[in-house]
Amino acid sequence: MSEMINTPVDGTLDATGLNCPEPVMMLHQHIRDLVPGGLLKVIATDPSTRRDIPKFCVFLDHELVGQHEEAGTYLYWIRKKSG
């Protein structure tokens, strides 16, 4: 999903250096503040986000548009559900 790297987003969450459960807790707040249909980019370094963020999206009905891993940094693009 490297084509997502330069995609314009409506918000960015930098969770670099934070460990579970902090990235998902912060994600919950950022998604809440995002407009419906908005695109959020998440930057994380905790490997557990590879499991936690996709589950978060499924559980709360948001769309995981893309994800990318490079040199221990995990990038996610999440579209907030509409309505």
Swiss-Prot record:
GO terms for molecular function: sulfur carrier activity. Its main location: cytoplasm. Keywords: Cytoplasm. InterPro entries: Sulphur_carrier_TusA, TusA-like, TusA-like_sf. Gene3D superfamilies: TusA-like domain. GO terms for biological process: tRNA wobble position uridine thiolation. SUPFAM superfamilies: SirA-like. GO terms for cellular component: cytoplasm. CDD domains: SirA. The keyword Membrane does not apply. The keyword Magnesium does not apply. It is found in: Cytoplasm. The active site is at residue 20. Pfam families: TusA (PF01206). Signal peptide: none annotated. Belongs to the sulfur carrier protein TusA family. NCBIfam families: PRK00299.1 (NF001423). Sulfur carrier protein which probably makes part of a sulfur-relay system. This is Sulfur carrier protein TusA. It comes from Pseudomonas fluorescens (strain Pf0-1).
